[in-house]
Amino acid sequence: MKQYLWAGALALVWSASSPARAEDAYLARARALLARSPVIDGHIDVPEQLKERRDNKLEGFDFTNIPGQQASYNVDLTRLKAGGYGGVFWSVYVPVELGPDEAVRATFDQIDVMRRLIDRYPERMTLAATAAEARAGMRQGKIIGFLGAEGGHSIHNSLGVLRDFYALGVRYMTLTHFANTDWADSATASPAHDGLAPFGREVVHEMNRMGMLVDISHVSAKTMADALDVSVAPVIFSHSGAQAVNHSPRNVPDAILARLPANGVVAMVNFFPGYVSEAVRQWNGAHAAEEARAKSLNPGDTKAAAAALAAWDKANPLPHATVQQVADHIDHIRKIAGIDHIGIGSDYDGIETTPDGLEDPSGVPNLFAELLRRGYSEADCAKIADGNILRALAQAEQVAARLQRERAPGEAVFAAK
């Protein structure tokens, strides 16, 4: 009798632990997969953090393992390697509120500080200029880096500045940020140009000619459509999700997702909870409305307004975004556009909160484990990790080689209305 009871107990223990064992198996597979096909992240904001926290001074800064990491920076070399990273597009972002000349200077400063940071770790990091250089660097076990300029305001309507950025390692430029430029409409501003203005088309032409990827995150749906019409090379969304899953205008409508295959677009999925979780997006809207209400009911009394808002927050706790919800965006993009058009664009170090399980790059294997659990093949996951974005960049380089044989650098000059 005792041996039957013992056998039954073992069966119960095995049954109870088998889901955890299965999850551990998915995670182990994800880690092994990323060791072979490391993640290239389309958008990480380390340069912005270096500006805001250190005024671009690197003396005494240890990027291998940043102390107090959870409370400040998401990213360092230790966590990138733990997450199976092989490469990053380092975002060189400056606020849209800067004056035009100051924005150009500040962007050059962002480029400079990131290049200096990479140079401090030659055994672990390298700046790549091409897809082939990226593959070679990753084979050496290094974190390869490209630069990405976040917002066309950074060039102050100058194709010459755009070319200077390319020469310094910038391999994509986001056409707008949260505000319109003089030549393109943003997703989060009232339209001024009905999409892409004539000079914006010249910007896209010149980016194609150089081999710089056109990034249409942050832009309006009409600007997205216009960029797809104009560009003869693959474009990207460096950090955006699916609008059908989260209704933010920062995400991509299905009508645009359906066009991704024709252009070779890669939509690199963002981790910002407000763009991932519809519940978080709605909470953010309600919180903003409640904050305005508290201020209007307590004019001039900031303490009373803050207390009222704190009471509302306590009664209405912020929902959490999850790894599973990020995977839902990937599922939807795969359904509409196909597996060849998905990547990862976390926005780490540019966001204040993150989905549970994706608190920093070391958690990214959790996302790939979730995809494997949902039935994605390892070949599918390898495309999402780095295959798709390297393919898009290589195709853009091929287009550029042809265009450079056919035409000289663009000489268009912006003319204000």
Predicted feature residues:
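Alpha-helix-loop-beta-strand connector modules within alpha/beta enzyme cores
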Residues: 118, 192-210, 227-237, 370
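Histidine-centered catalytic micro-motifs
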Residues: 39-46, 219, 237-241
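Bacterial N-terminal signal peptides
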Residues: 7-16
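Positively charged n-region of N-terminal signal peptides that target proteins for export
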Residues: 1-4
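Substrate-binding cleft of carbohydrate-active enzyme catalytic domains
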Residues: 203-216, 222-226, 256-262, 332
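Short, contiguous, pocket-lining structural segments
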Residues: 192-199, 215-220, 252
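N-terminal hydrophobic targeting/anchoring segments and the immediately downstream early-domain regions
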Residues: 21-194, 247-417
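Distinct, well-ordered alpha-helical segments
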Residues: 158-162, 223-233
